[in-house]
Amino acid sequence: MQSAKQKISDMASTAKEKMVICQAKADEKAERAMARTKEEKEIAHQRRKAKEAEANMDMHMAKAAHAEDKLMAKQSHYHVTDHGPHVPQQAPVPAPAPVMGHGYGHNPTGVTSVPPQTYHPTYPPTGHHNHHHY
């Protein structure tokens, strides 16, 4: 039952994304028609791309939420306990605001896309090496 519910929810999210993309394309067409310079036309194009990316991100966030709902429903059948009051789960962490920059994958100063780690692997690993030459 949850699989069907997830599929329907995913289809609704995809349809919403396609609708937003279609609206963004129509907005771009109207902006380009009113634009007088090449730069204004490029700005309209970039706005459309940003709207499409945001719609795509929203769709994927919704699909992740649907998968989480399915998992929680599946797990709740296996973990039936009456050991006290239900403790609500933490709210999901909101997605970071999109960075409007000049390049793909660039982060603002002080922000990294890689979480800090204490483990620093080395290659080749230190120690005795058995090299087999055939």
From Swiss-Prot:
Source species of the chain: Arabidopsis thaliana (Mouse-ear cress)
Family according to the record: Belongs to the LEA type 1 family.
Region (Disordered) residue spans: 31-53, 80-134
Sequence ranges of Low complexity compositional bias: 115-127
Bias-annotated ranges (Basic and acidic residues): 31-45
Any one GO BP annotation for this protein: seed development
Gene: LEA6
Any coiled-coil regions, as ranges: 34-70
Annotated keywords: Coiled coil, Stress response
Expression induction: By dehydration stress.
Name of the molecule in the record: Late embryogenesis abundant protein 6
Main function: Involved dehydration tolerance. Involved in the adaptive response of vascular plants to withstand water deficit. May possess chaperone-like activity under water deficit.
Superkingdom field: Eukaryota
One cellular component (GO) term of this entry: plasmodesma
InterPro entries: LEA_1
